[in-house]
Amino acid sequence: MAARSELLRPAFGEASPSLGRFVINPHSCSYRWWHMFLIMLVLYSAWASPFELSMEKAASIALVVTDLVVDVFFAIDIALSFFVAYRDTSTGLLITDRRKITMRYLKRPCFALDVASTIPLQIIYQLVTGKRQGLWGLLNLLRLWRLRRVSKLFARVEKDIRFNYLWTRLIKLLCVTLFALHFAACIYLWMAFNYKIKELTWIGSQIHSFEDRSVWFCYTCAVYWSITTLATVGYGDLHATNIGEMLFSIAFMLFNMGLTSYIIGNITNLVVRETSNTFKMRDMVQRVSEFGRMNRLPEAMREQMLASVQLRFRTDEQLQQEMLSELPKAVRSGVMKHMFKSAIESCYLFQGVSDSLIVQLVAEMKAEFFPPKANVILENETSTDCYIIISGEVEALTTLADGTEKHVKRIGPRGMAGEIGVMFSIPQPFTIRSRRLTQVVRISHIHLLQAVRPNTADGYIVFSNFIQYLESLKVQTKDVAFVSDHLWNGNSMVLRRATEVAVDESKEAAHKMLPCKEPKRVVIHEQLPNATSTALHPSPGKLVLLPDSMQELMKLSEKKFGKAVRGILTVEGAEVEDIEVIRDGDHLLFS
């Protein structure tokens, strides 16, 4: 029953709290069952206390004996409260010291009210004076202090996901309404039975000698008037006839206004909360439809957009991403590893890699759903992501010279799509389209390279798997122009380097294993001292291949010119800080 936030938690650096002798854990099952038993007694007290007050003859021997038994149980609970550990709100620690527990309970106002609501003051007053009527009968209402336990119960149940929040709130509102009706009806009866002139009461003006009628007849009349007043219908058959009843009716109707507003506001909030996703989906579908009409999109494209939007809401894709993003990174990685590790390990590109690389890859993966006939990747678009098929099926298509699409192959679960463009750093060669409802996980180009670069051995395995896949793809699709062009022509050097590179632990070898474009060629010059104008017309330099890092470039310059190099400048005099900004054919000066 308890929410997770109520579990015991020690302070940072301290061991879990241990309970001392004769100290009760407030979150133990036995103590919670005791609380649930007391809740049943509280419900009885909430009904019996106003009912016994309303009419003297309502307090029968059976009710009096039951009240005494209930008071005994609450007296036992008061005694147990001196042994129940509590949580310090300032530190969040569970206090188990008996002396602190006792002093805290004695100093709190609830101790005095607990005792006052448990002592049978009305019975003692009746035994001493022999009277029950009068204002002393109101002491019986002190037992309503126990209702705070019900409020705490509802607050705890509302946070418990095992219970439906909607029904919990509705039951709470119903209980509040029923208690308000019952309490008002009992007060109306108490005022009528204690007024001197019975004919000048709300019930006496309509029913003569009502005090001789049965208890349940009078109670039914009182509940009837109470509920008509609460519902603001007011048939007029019953009405206030003296000043006291008028004043109480005014107070009761003011209370009814607030209670009605509270109930309407809560129910409205619950209904809106239950239907908010439907409203969002309808609004999004309407906006997508209007967007398609305004921009005169083809009908097939509009249907794809609508299907994607509807699928997104049906699968709660956005909710899943928001939920995962709020989790700590370690927890999120553990969840993603549990969900997608087997799929990645069985994917051809990552077969045989280490578990550490798998963990790095799943940490930033994102799950997505695609409806049937939806384009996952478009041909010739920028290669930013590759996809692993978790369920469903997609097909690879290529566009011929006449504009028609030609089927290349089908890709089922555990297959990959988009990896060719990512590995070669070229536009996507195929259009990838889903054949039915398909779930995929997306790996970004940047994250894939960041995960593979530091892992030299894993990088070798990845690119070896990729080469084998391209070989098999060429055999399967002999008539697809892309495969022959890129496998044997433009990237033949890349493939040879990937297969011939030895597994080296150095950082340079890890970079060489990655597919790269044709090396850049630059001209390096030795900057002449005290010659500002030479920067614009430098002396003839040396044509070299651009290395992979600034450190290698400076070492190469020192080797060529035979002197230490402190920095690298362009011919315009700008200092170069990143090797990536240097273009093919640039002239560089060294200082």
Curated annotation (Swiss-Prot):
Positions of a nucleoside 3',5'-cyclic phosphate binding: 349-469
Intramembrane segments: 221-240
One example GO MF annotation: voltage-gated potassium channel activity
Segments traversing the membrane: 33-53, 64-84, 110-130, 138-158, 173-193, 247-267
Cellular localization per UniProt: Membrane
Coiled-coil blocks: none
KHA domain boundaries: 521-591
Domain of life assignment: Eukaryota
Extracellular side: 54-63, 131-137, 194-220, 241-246
GO cellular component: monoatomic ion channel complex
SMART domains cross-referenced by the UniProt entry: cNMP
Record topological domains on the Cytoplasmic side: 1-32, 85-109, 159-172, 268-591
Membrane topology: Multi-pass membrane protein
Keyword Phosphoprotein (UniProt): no
Domain commentary: The segment S4 is probably the voltage-sensor and is characterized by a series of positively charged amino acids. The pore-forming region H5 is enclosed by the transmembrane segments S5 and S6 in the Shaker-type (1P/6TM) and contains the GYGD signature motif which seems to be involved in potassium selectivity.
Stated role: Probable inward-rectifying potassium channel. Assuming opened or closed conformations in response to the voltage difference across the membrane, the channel is activated by hyperpolarization.
Family: Belongs to the potassium channel family. Plant (TC 1.A.1.4) subfamily.
UniProt-recorded name of the protein: Potassium channel KAT4
Organism: Oryza sativa subsp. japonica
Lineage per the UniProt record: Eukaryota, Viridiplantae, Streptophyta, Embryophyta, Tracheophyta
